[in-house]
UniProtKB/Swiss-Prot annotation:
Active-site annotation: K62
Key word Cell membrane present: no
Reactions catalysed: orotidine 5'-phosphate + H(+) = UMP + CO2
Record-level GO cellular component terms: cytosol
Residue ranges that the Swiss-Prot or TrEMBL entry lists as coiled coil: none
Species name: Vibrio atlanticus (strain LGP32) (Vibrio splendidus (strain Mel32))
Listed name of the protein: Orotidine 5'-phosphate decarboxylase
Subunit annotation: Homodimer.
Family: Belongs to the OMP decarboxylase family. Type 1 subfamily.
Length: 231
C-alpha cells in the first residue's frame, strides 16, 4: 500500500451515512480519521467496519490523563489495530513516555503515536485565557520538542509550523496537519489553514481534510484531484 498522505476526517452523527460515504472511496486513496463524536456514538465496532473495508484508521481521541490511565487507553487503541493514535502533549513527558513504552511489545505492528500541540482553532488570545502569555507558534515548538524527547513519532500541528518543526526536529519526525482546505474550499472553523500541496511543501507528512471531501458530490474525484497535486 502506498503511504497515503490524505487522512479524511469522518464527522458524521449517523453510522449509515458514514459507511455510505466510505463505500464511495478507495482505501488506496486515503486513510480515515475517527474522532470523539463518532467513537463515542459507535465505538470500536465502527473502527472494525472501516478495517474490514481495507482502510487504515487514525483514532483521534487526544488522550490526556494520568500516565497509567492514558497509556492503557493507548494500548486499547493498539489492540483495535489502528494505524495512528494521539495524546495531548500538554499531559507532559511522563504521560507520553508511559504511552510510548506500553506500545513496545507490538513491535512493527504498533500504531504511530502522535502528540497534539496547539489546537488549530486556538489563537494567541485563547492561549492567554489559559495563562500562556506566548504566541501559538512558541507553544507548538515547546510541546513538539517535549513530544520528540518523549520518544513519540510526531505531532499534530498547523501547516504554518511545519517547516519550522521539520528544521528543528528532523525529517523523520512526522507532522500531521489539520486545517487543510483545497483551493476554493470553505475555510470553516479552522483558524490556521493551507492548501494540500503547500502543506506538503512546507513539511507536513499527513493532511487531515474533512468537509471538502465528505461533502463533495464526487468524493473519489476530489481525492484523485488532491492526490494529483501531491504527486
Amino acid at each position: 500500500m502506498n503511504d497515503q498522505k490524505i487522512i479524511v476526517a469522518l464527522d458524521y452523527d449517523n453510522q449509515a451515512d458514514a459507511l455510505a460515504f466510505v463505500d464511495r472511496i478507495d482505501p488506496a486513496s486515503c486513510r480515515l480519521k475517527v474522532g470523539k463524536e463518532m467513537f463515542t456514538l459507535f465505538g470500536p465496532e465502527f473502527v472494525r467496519e472501516l478495517h474490514k473495508r481495507g482502510f487504515s484508521v487514525f483514532l483521534d481521541l487526544k488522550f490526556h490523563d494520568i500516565p497509567n490511565t492514558c497509556s492503557k487507553a493507548v494500548r486499547a487503541a493498539a489492540e483495535m489495530g489502528v494505524w495512528m493514535v494521539n495524546v495531548h502533549a500538554s499531559g507532559g513527558e511522563r504521560m507520553m513516555t508511559a504511552s510510548r513504552e506500553i506500545l513496545e511489545p507490538y513491535g512493527k505492528d504498533r500504531p504511530l503515536l502522535i502528540g497534539v500541540t496547539v489546537l488549530t482553532s486556538m489563537e494567541q488570545s485563547d492561549l492567554a485565557g489559559i495563562g500562556l502569555d506566548l504566541e501559538p507558534q512558541q507553544q507548538v515548538m515547546r510541546l513538539a520538542s517535549l513530544t520528540k524527547n518523549s520518544g513519540l513519532d510526531g505531532v499534530v500541528c498547523s501547516a504554518q509550523e511545519a517547516s519550522l518543526l521539520k528544521g528543528a526536529l528532523g525529517q523523520e519526525f512526522k507532522l500531521v496537519t489539520p486545517g487543510i482546505r483545497p483551493v476554493g474550499a470553505d475555510v470553516g472553523d479552522q483558524k490556521r489553514i493551507m492548501t494540500p500541496s503547500k502543506a506538503i511543501e512546507s513539511g507536513s507528512d499527513y493532511l487531515v481534510i474533512g468537509r471538502p471531501i465528505t461533502q463533495a458530490i464526487d468524493p473519489a474525484a476530489v481525492l484523485a484531484e488532491i492526490n494529483g497535486t501531491l504527486a
